[in-house]
Regions:
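N-terminal membrane-anchoring alpha-helices
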Residues: 1-25
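Soluble catalytic domains of membrane acyltransferases
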Residues: 16-166
């Protein structure tokens, strides 16, 4: 499977993030063999994916699973509202509800579509996710997945969501 080169704007954004945020330290529980691997990571809000895609030492050979809805500007507003990016019932919730989803729709898809991602579908297209993942693994690349169970505003359970594909 041939990978498209990362856009200059995505590379510049990654360089900016690396320069302006704390370094990431990778600590291996077991020595890493270099074989194609699936890295199961903590989402930690937006920081887990940003750290793994921008700072992880193996980032150039990694492909992150991303909810397909955030790759499509038309679907982002509904996804953002459902994912609770602001405290429900707060004084600013009405304003956030009419602004943040559309700002996210303008910003997220161009960035994420430029990144080495694999769309994760939650319908019959889930097989597309699996096929793409297997192709990258067979090509010697790695996967990054974030399978925690969302549990409300600024909160995720720390256990793996065993039904994260459906």
């Amino acid at each position: 499977m041939e990978e498209l080169p990362l856009s200059k704007s995505y590379q510049a954004l990654c360089s900016f993030v690396r320069a302006c945020t704390p370094r990431m330290k990778t600590v291996w529980a077991e020595p890493f063999s270099g074989a194609p691997s699936v890295f199961v990571c903590n989402h930690a809000g937006a920081f887990g994916p940003i750290d793994m895609c921008v700072k992880f030492p193996l980032r150039d050979k990694c492909h992150a699973w991303v909810n397909a809805q955030v790759l499509d500007a038309k679907q982002v507003p509904a996804y953002v509202r459902q994912d609770y990016w602001w405290k429900p019932g707060s004084l600013l919730a009405p304003l956030c509800n009419v602004t943040l989803p559309y700002l996210a729709a303008a910003v997220l898809p161009p960035i994420l579509n430029a990144a080495p991602t694999i769309p994760v579908y939650h319908d019959a297209r889930v097989m597309t996710t699996m096929r793409q993942s297997l192709k990258w693994l067979k090509a010697g690349e790695h996967l990054i997945i974030f399978p925690e169970q969302p549990s409300g505003f600024q909160s995720h359970h720390d256990w793996i969501n065993t039904g994260f594909l459906n």
